[in-house]
Amino acid sequence: MLVIGESINASNKSVAEAIAGRDREFLENLAKAEAAAGADFIDVNAGAGYSSPEREMAAMEWLVDVVQGATDKPLTIDSDNPSMIKVALGKYRGERLIINSVTAEPERLESIGSLAAERQAWLVALAMGTSGIPNNVEERLAACDQIMEQLTHLGLREEQIFFDPLVLPIAVDSTQGIVTLKTLQEIKSRYPDARTVMGLSNISYGLPNRKLVNRAFLLMAAYAGLDAVILDPLDAKTMGFIKV
């Protein structure tokens, strides 16, 4: 199973501060730690909410440069903004990469899908359309069908697509874990050459003993056909589950 290190994300306060302050050493050390812990890819997310598009682009460009200089691990470019992704791809020197992510929303699917096809990147596709996250398996699969049709039309191969079945907190709706696992199984059945990925920590949001919940769900997802996971590789016990 591929591991995508999630730590270099501006939703984390310390990372956001490091990006804003251009603290190269902090981010280099974090990237090196994720790589040493066993991450196969390093996710980079420079965040949003900047005072201008130019500042937003500059932050992503700088972040990609810092992280790829700290490790030889390939990167996951984490943004749903086509302009941000294009800037990041222009700075990225590696051959292997993942773009994270698209939905079935037509305009961004076209623009981001085209960027992925041009670079022959792997692409994460969320099982949702324009109306938010579906709460049932059928609507998530319908979104996957739309995405697959468009991306293959743009020139991506099935095996370049990582479908994310979507993970919602079971503290809010206890049925959502089952919905995710069933969606995962159906994706693998419909598209045997496609890959699957999920962000693990969402499942336990709002619960005590979150790491225990995460580990239990990871095992169930692996059994259902999960190919890759976005998580904190510095959590040695969870990484131990993957290495078993």
Predicted regions and their residues:
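Catalytic beta/alpha-barrel core
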Residues: 43-46, 73-81, 96-107, 124-127, ...
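Active-site-adjacent beta->alpha loops and helix N-cap segments on the catalytic face
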Residues: 51-62, 79-87, 104-117, 132-142, ...
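Glycine-rich, proline-tolerant flexible connector loops at the mouths of alpha/beta enzymes
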Residues: 35-73, 165-177
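Structural preference for beta-strand elements that scaffold enzyme active sites
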Residues: 1-3, 40-43, 74-76, 96-98, ...
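Acidic (Asp/Glu)-rich catalytic clusters
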Residues: 35-36, 69, 89-93, 110-121, ...
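Alpha-helix-loop-beta-strand connector modules within alpha/beta enzyme cores
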Residues: 53-79, 83-94, 181-198
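Catalytic alpha/beta core domains of metabolic enzymes, predominantly
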Residues: 119-244
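Active-site mouth loops of central-metabolism enzymes
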Residues: 4-29, 53-55, 100-106, 131-138, ...
